[in-house]
Amino acid sequence: MNAKFILLLLVVTTTMLLPDTQGAEVIKCRTPKDCADPCRKQTGCPHGKCMNRTCRCNRCG
């Protein structure tokens, strides 16, 4: 019983701590500057990161 409760807490905590990102569309990049225009078109905000040669767009405020 205790192990199930701990596992449930771990799952809930993990989902709460995941970053708020959008991006079903795969955008190839080499630098974060490559992500600004595609992210602006996708989310309306130029905030994005280039991670593993793929843009990860973040929402504004």
Curated annotation (Swiss-Prot):
Disulfide bond residue pairs: C29-C50, C35-C55, C39-C57, C45-C60
GO MF annotations, alphabetized: ion channel inhibitor activity; potassium channel regulator activity; toxin activity
Ranges in a coiled coil: none
Modified residues (Cysteine amide): C60
Domain comment, as recorded: Has the structural arrangement of an alpha-helix connected to antiparallel beta-sheets by disulfide bonds (CS-alpha/beta).
Keyword Membrane appears in the UniProt entry: no
Gene Ontology CC terms, in alphabetical order: extracellular region
Pfam families in the record: Toxin_2 (PF00451)
Extent of the signal sequence: 1-23
UniProt keyword terms in alphabetical order: Amidation, Disulfide bond, Ion channel impairing toxin, Neurotoxin, Potassium channel impairing toxin, Secreted, Signal, Toxin
Name this protein carries in UniProt: Potassium channel toxin alpha-KTx 6.7
Keyword Secreted found: yes
Biological classification of the source: Eukaryota, Metazoa, Ecdysozoa, Arthropoda, Chelicerata
